[in-house]
Amino acid sequence: ESTTDAEDKNVSVNDTEEKEHIVVTDSIGRNVEIPYPVTKAVVANAYNTEIINAVGALDCVVGVDYNIYQDKESWKNRFTEDMVIGKSQKDLNYEKIIELQPEVLILTGNGTWEEAEKQLEPFGIKVIVCNAYYTNEFEKSCDILGKVFAREEKAEELKKYFMEKLDYIQNQLKDVPKKRVYFEYRTEGNTTVPGDFFYYMVEYSGADNIFKNASAVQVESEAVVEANPEYIIKVSASDVYSSYYPPTQEEHKAIKEEIMSRPGWDEIDAVKNDNILLLSHYVHGGASKLVGTMYIAKFLYPEQLSELHPETVFRDWLEEFQKLDYIEGHTYPEFSFED
């Protein structure tokens, strides 16, 4: 009998005390001591989950927020209702998290991480902030999540894939006059300004954001007409369901027609010259929105970026990094693999 006891005891000791511990510096500079590698995590925010998937650690995820759970197409139904840890990173169910017994909770900086820390500390569950929605923090997010799950090599591969393309864009556009762009997210007048979630997606494409000096994301229609952008980039519309399955051609067309028919917008160069690019909500967000950056860059500077093929990038993101089949139709106009 004593042997069995010892063995049982041994198993539990190995799971906890004897696991190596490391310190990870998270997105907001907190130093968090965690078991290494983490094998049980609960995660809020799809940007984080996508990178965890891309580094090959999705099997370690034992709980997700409702937004992730309900997007069944993007996650191939792998998350069940009993894995839901709350509506979003801002609305967490701590009882559920404790019940799932993860080693860490990973959430974004706009989530309730301070509250989470307070609630989960007594149960030994560590809280890691990872801001994978910020394009300019993509490398840092890869480093954090690669380290947490001991998938450093895969994280390096993921970083390299996208950073090489970003460097190419930067080098090719060094002396090129910037094209003036109006970016709109979902609803009319909702643009991007410094500090906002979409700012660097647009910035890294080499665009001159017409509202780069504005302080509020909501802008008046007249201000857009007055600024007269050469290009308009829009991420979907709020009434279009967005997931791995793209909007229909009809939905894309309706979004474009709505833009073109706004009062006074027929005066805008982008509308006159039909320089309007629509990105689905799903496609713009890949790899901390760097997939979105690739499409915007190519749309603005096709001659200078002959070796950048955003549709191929999107296919690689799906097939290699998300383990999903490639699907077309996420942009309007559509890009071929050669474009």
List PLM regions with ranges:
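Short, low-complexity disordered leader/linker segments with a strong preference
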Residues: 1-36
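A local structural motif
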Residues: 31-35, 77-85, 204-214
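Extracytoplasmic substrate-binding proteins
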Residues: 17-21, 31, 115-190, 208-212, ...
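Short, solvent-exposed loop/turn elements at domain surfaces
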Residues: 32-34, 49-54, 69-74, 189-194, ...
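Structural recognition of the beta-strand scaffold that forms the well-ordered cores
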Residues: 40-44, 62-65, 86, 104-108, ...
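A short, structured surface patch at a secondary-structure boundary
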Residues: 43-100, 104-110
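Short helix-initiation/N-cap motifs at beta->coil->alpha
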Residues: 27-29, 83-95, 214-221
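Flexible, glycine-rich surface segments
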Residues: 192-267
